[in-house]
Structures are given as C-alpha cells and as structure tokens.
Amino acid sequence: MSAREVHIDVNNKTGHTLQLEDKTKLDGGRWRTSPTNVANDQIKTFVAESNGFMTGTEGTIYYSINGEAEISLYFDNPFAGSNKYDGHSNKSQYEIITQGGSGNQSHVTYTIQTTSSRYGHKS
C-alpha cells in the first residue's frame, strides 16, 4: 500500500461516452489503474498513488463529450495537508457533482450529468 492513494469513481450520466483526452496527467505519483473512456450509464474506477518518499499524488483527468464539451476532474492527496477535489465543465449543460473523502487512502466520486437531470428530466 502506498503512503497516499486516491480511488477515483467516474459516474457518467451525460447520455454520451466520456472520451479520455491525451492531456490527462499526474503532477505527482503514478497510476495503479489508468483512466479510460467511460460509456454512458457506467461507473469506472481508477487509482492514483504516491511514488516516492514523503510524497502524495495529484492529477487531472480530462474528458471530452462529442469533441465539444471538456470535463476536468482534479484531485490532490498531499503528503501533508488536506485533500482537494474539483470538477469543471466548459459547457453549462454539464455539471460535475464531486464527493471526496479525507485520509491517506481517500475515495472521490465524480458524477457527470446534464444540468437538467437534477430536475428529473433529460435535455
């Protein structure tokens, strides 16, 4: 077990496949389970872990939707300090609900959905 880990669930509720972009990166650590495309109505789990003495893991996963919208999912589990998570879409019709935990072996769930789905109807 690594000193720091982030178990990342990506829950796709967009109606489209999330296409992994090449600019997905780790600023610290390594992938134990690398990100991949995520089909609609699927949940995929990826794991990033620290790789070295007194280090954490940090990175951003980038997805595109139909080559139009871009989704970014940021995570940081530092060796010292608080964990941070953030999700962002460059198109207002998609939102990211981020639920992240604390601790050295943390878990975060990013649910990517159409903005209207929170009101019980699809666009």
UniProtKB/Swiss-Prot annotation:
Q: Which UniProt keywords apply?
A: Sporulation, Toxin, Virulence
Query: Sorted alphabetically, which InterPro entries does this protein's record hold?
Result: Aegerolysin-typ (IPR009413), Cytolysin/lectin (IPR015926)
Instruction: Enumerate the Gene Ontology biological process terms.
Output: sporulation resulting in formation of a cellular spore; symbiont-mediated hemolysis of host erythrocyte
User: Practical use of this protein?
Assistant: Expression of the 2 toxin genes in transgenic corn confers resistance to WCR and has been commercialized.
Induction section of the entry: Probably part of the cry34Ab1-cry35Ab1 operon.
Asked if the record carries the keyword Cytoplasm, the reply is no
Q: Give the SUPFAM superfamilies listed for this entry.
A: Cytolysin/lectin (SSF63724)
Q: Does the keyword Transcription apply?
A: no
Mind listing the GO molecular function terms for this protein?
toxin activity
Taxonomically, the superkingdom here is Bacteria
The record ties this protein, via Pfam families, to: Aegerolysin
Query: What protein family is recorded?
Result: Belongs to the aegerolysin family.
Subunit and partners: Monomer in solution. Copurifies from parasporal inclusion bodies with Cry35Ab1.
Protein function: Component of a binary insecticidal toxin active on western corn rootworm (WCR, Diabrotica virgifera subsp. virgifera Le Conte) and probably also on northern corn rootworm (D.barberi). Both proteins are required for maximal toxicity. The larval midgut epithelium is probably the primary target. This protein alone is also active against southern corn rootworm (Diabrotica undecimpunctata howardi Barber), but its activity is synergized by its Cry35Ab1 partner. The 2 proteins individually and together form ion channels; channels made in the presence of the 2 proteins have higher conductance.
Other information = Iodination or fluorescein-5-maleimide modification makes the protein non-toxic to WCR.
Q: What is this protein called?
A: Insecticidal crystal protein Cry34Ab1
From which source organism is this entry?
Bacillus thuringiensis
Q: What is the lineage of its organism?
A: Bacteria, Bacillati, Bacillota, Bacilli, Bacillales
